[in-house]
Amino acid sequence: MKKFIALLFFILLLSGCGVNSQKSQGEDVSPDSNIETKEGTYVGLADTHTIEVTVDNEPVSLDITEESTSDLDKFNSGDKVTITYEKNDEGQLLLKDIERAN
């Protein structure tokens, strides 16, 4: 009987050491895989939540977040900038960072 209880205890102990590999809600599958950095020319605000930057002679619209909105006041149309953005699952370009190009 003692061996049976010891065996049962050992099995329970090992089952508690298992690893749960389920993805938690909101966790990215591949972080930073869709983030790009490019240089371009700042055009300006397209609307209250979008800026336009010309990259490789093509206009690019980027959705801005509350964090990136505060930085936009220091840029004028025609400024050379370096943008870091992420392309989400819907194909939208989300601005992560904008800086003056050197």
From Swiss-Prot:
Its subcellular locations are: Cell membrane
Membrane topology qualifier: Lipid-anchor
Q: What is its main location?
A: membrane
What upregulates this protein? Repressed by LytR.
Q: Where is the lipid attached (S-diacylglycerol cysteine)?
A: 17
Top-rank taxon, per record: Bacteria
- Residues annotated as signal peptide: 1-16
The species this protein was found in: Bacillus subtilis (strain 168)
Record key words, sorted: Cell membrane, Lipoprotein, Membrane, Palmitate, Signal
Which GO terms of the cellular component aspect does the record hold?
Answer: plasma membrane
Report the protein's function. Answer: Possible role in the secretion of LytB and LytC.
Which positions are lipidated as N-palmitoyl cysteine? 17
Q: What name goes with this protein?
A: Membrane-bound protein LytA
